[in-house]
Amino acid sequence: MNNYQNVDVDKLANIYFEGKVISRNIFLKDGSKKTLGVMLEGGYEFKTASRELMEIHSGKLNVKIAGDQDWTLITEGMDFNVPQNSSFCLEVLELVNYTCSYFDN
């Protein structure tokens, strides 16, 4: 899917890491929340409260989820899951466009 229809969008962006990671919250009609964002090259660490699905639409990054020993290369068209109450490290190698979906369990 290249777009979302009939959604509500927060006017203010979520800005992290001195503007190197920027996203906007969108809310679907079923009540679910997603963020659409862009990450510039660099290293980042995020913590999760809920389970997350990260879909990579363009670019390239390495990810290491808490508890993993090795980095995993993720490229355009790939995704990865992060458990709730966890964390993950990213090494963005090329500008990334992404969607993050949040789940209750």
Question: What does each model-found stretch correspond to?
Answer:
Residues 83-105:
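Ligand-binding loop in jelly-roll beta-barrel domains
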Residues 35, 45, 62, 89, ...:
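General beta-strand recognition
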Residues 68-88:
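Short acidic-glycine-tyrosine-enriched beta hairpin
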